[in-house]
């Protein structure tokens, strides 16, 4: 009995060898499939960090200050931090701004930097060229946000540096540090996508506290834009109430928005200030206005940002009284918007010696236009195929079959009405298919048209009219842009052409009240003037 039972148990025992082999093969197939769908196609590009840094990871418990090196490395990997940590950094830095004067007073040595515009990876190159913030005094002239796709990283990193080095790193306000421009351009959308609207609101409150100007070494007035007909002395700047959204006119607006005349130093008339027709607000100021202000306030020069420069900087005509350039423009965003192909520059001033250091752009991760995700981007492709299938399905039923079916089913006028409803639906789906097809084949034209049209939206009816409608709308928008100084061609071949095409985006956006326009001063675009003091160091290749 015992042997019989053992034999039966032996016969009933399953064969585990084949089962184990099958499971192992299945696991290998799953791993292969998983690797196929998760492995990076471009292996040199790292996958963005998904984990957000906590407050404890961002802040050093011993010092109570942000670990800016940790933030830098995390942001380089496209990482983000928890909202609580982001808000704490911004609010702590805002308290420092509020305790600073409207016009800072900074002693040399100092390194002056121009526009950053959300180009975080180029900001890393800037610190590599200019020196560590731990050992180098920095003054930034504003425009940290908009246009580029890493604006919030620039803000959080610079604000963290300010907390760590409050007496050696200084930040001024630019014209883009306001609600009006950040809503119109990209910063608000970026904050909502990467963090939340609350983070955006905290940033706006912080921007309201930024100083407006700096007196460097008692010799140089540093400001984002330039002069104002309402500002005659440095005391006029000190008296400005800066804790607010910048107005559309007045001295605060002028400090952020004004520009030198295009024929600065070679003016055809003696007018010191004229309406800024390029910006749509504020003023152009002349060489005479600049020299008068410098002489009246016993200054050597004005250092400002606000305008892209092919070489990253520009030194204007020398003052007859001092023999020093009366005006210097610094721009620190290389290959601006990924199309200008310009160099960036920073200005180092030490021991009464001014040194310009140039640098080129650095590689950065790619974002689809307007922070679009891949699903939104691919919607026209998917939509085209889905609507094609629907149209084919509906077209299976011919008009004769439709009439015969409706005659049998409905009595009187009900059948005719039903047929008309079905025909309307077929035509509507066909129209939708046409729109998706246009989007599919003309995606580049749509992007160009969105870029030209105010607010980044398509003109009404452009898609429904098909390719002809898109081309017609594009020609109309191009002609409108040309009236604002844009080149009619859309293949950008030079820095000057890029600047002309982008001129429409340099204006103050609509829906903001501006004072009555004065007679604009029309001047030709000047050729590059010979700089009285060439840079001592050439560009460093990235």
From Swiss-Prot:
Region (Calcineurin B binding): 366-394
Annotated binding of Fe cation, by residue: 115, 117, 143
PROSITE patterns registered for this protein in UniProt: SER_THR_PHOSPHATASE
Keywords: Behavior, Calmodulin-binding, Cell projection, Chemotaxis, Cytoplasm, Endocytosis, Hydrolase, Iron, Metal-binding, Protein phosphatase, Zinc
Catalytic, as annotated region: 81-365
Top-level lineage group: Eukaryota
Annotated region described as Disordered, given as residue ranges: 1-33, 502-542
GO cellular component, one term: cytoplasm
Description of how activity is regulated: Activated by Ca(2+)-bound calmodulin following an increase in intracellular Ca(2+). At low Ca(2+) concentrations, the catalytic subunit (also known as calcineurin A) is inactive and is bound to the regulatory subunit (also known as calcineurin B) in which only two high-affinity binding sites are occupied by Ca(2+).
Compositionally skewed regions (Low complexity) per UniProt: 16-26, 514-531
Reported cofactor(s): Fe(3+); Zn(2+)
Domain comment as written in the entry: The autoinhibitory domain prevents access to the catalytic site.
Protein name: Serine/threonine-protein phosphatase 2B catalytic subunit
Organism placement in taxonomy: Eukaryota, Metazoa, Ecdysozoa, Nematoda, Chromadorea
């Amino acid at each position: 009995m015992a042997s019989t039972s053992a034999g039966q148990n032996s016969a009933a025992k399953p064969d585990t060898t084949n089962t184990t082999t099958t499971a192992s093969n299945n696991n290998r197939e799953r791993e292969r499939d998983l690797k196929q769908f998760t492995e990076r196609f471009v292996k040199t590009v790292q996958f963005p960090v998904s984990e957000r840094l906590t407050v404890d990871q961002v802040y050093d418990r011993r010092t109570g200050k942000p670990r800016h090196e940790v933030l830098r490395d995390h942001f380089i990997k496209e990482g983000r931090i928890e909202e609580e940590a982001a808000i704490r950094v911004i609010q702590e830095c805002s308290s420092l701004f509020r305790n600073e004067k409207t016009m800072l007073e900074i002693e040399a040595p100092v390194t002056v930097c121009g526009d950053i515009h959300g180009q975080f990876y180029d900001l890393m190159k800037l610190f590599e060229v200019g020196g560590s913030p731990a050992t180098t005094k920095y003054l930034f002239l504003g425009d940290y946000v908009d246009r580029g796709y890493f604006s919030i990283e620039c803000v959080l990193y610079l604000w963290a540096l300010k907390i760590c080095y409050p007496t050696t790193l200084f930040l001024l306000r630019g014209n883009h540090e306001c609600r009006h421009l950040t809503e119109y351009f990209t910063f608000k959308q970026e904050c909502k996508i990467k963090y939340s609207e609350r983070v955006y609101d905290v940033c706006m409150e912080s921007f309201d506290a930024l100083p407006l100007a700096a007196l460097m070494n008692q010799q140089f007035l540093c400001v984002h834009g330039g002069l104002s007909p309402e500002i005659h002395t440095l005391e006029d700047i000190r008296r400005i109430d800066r804790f607010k959204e910048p107005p559309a006119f007045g001295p605060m607006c002028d400090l952020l928005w004004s520009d030198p005349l295009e024929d600065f130093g070679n003016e055809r008339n003696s007018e010191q200030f004229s309406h800024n027709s390029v910006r749509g607000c504020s003023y152009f100021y002349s060489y005479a206005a600049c020299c008068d202000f410098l002489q009246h306030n016993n200054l050597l020069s004005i250092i400002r940002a606000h305008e892209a420069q092919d070489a990253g900087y520009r030194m204007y005509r020398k003052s007859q009284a001092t023999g020093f350039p009366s005006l210097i423009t610094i721009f620190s965003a290389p290959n601006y918007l990924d199309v200008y192909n310009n160099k960036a520059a920073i200005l180092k001033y030490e021991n009464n010696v001014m040194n310009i250091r140039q640098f080129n752009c650095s590689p950065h991760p790619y974002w689809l236009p307007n922070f679009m995700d891949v699903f939104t981007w691919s919607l026209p492709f998917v939509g085209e195929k889905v609507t094609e299938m629907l149209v084919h399905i509906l077209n299976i039923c011919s008009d004769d079959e439709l009439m015969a079916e409706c005659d049998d089913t409905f009595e009187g006028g009900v059948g005719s009405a039903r047929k008309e409803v079905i025909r309307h639906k077929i035509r509507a789906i066909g129209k939708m298919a046409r729109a998706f097809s246009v989007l599919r084949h003309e995606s580049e034209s749509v992007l160009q048209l969105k870029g030209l049209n105010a607010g980044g939206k398509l003109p009404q009816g452009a898609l429904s009219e098909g390719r002809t409608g898109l081309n017609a709308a594009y020609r109309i928008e191009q002609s409108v842009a040309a009236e604002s100084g844009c080149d009619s061609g859309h293949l950008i071949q030079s820095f000057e052409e890029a600047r002309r095409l982008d001129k429409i985006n340099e204006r103050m956006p609509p829906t903001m009240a501006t004072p009555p326009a004065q007679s604009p001063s029309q001047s030709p675009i000047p050729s590059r003037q010979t700089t009285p003091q060439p840079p001592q160091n050439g560009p460093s290749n990235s």
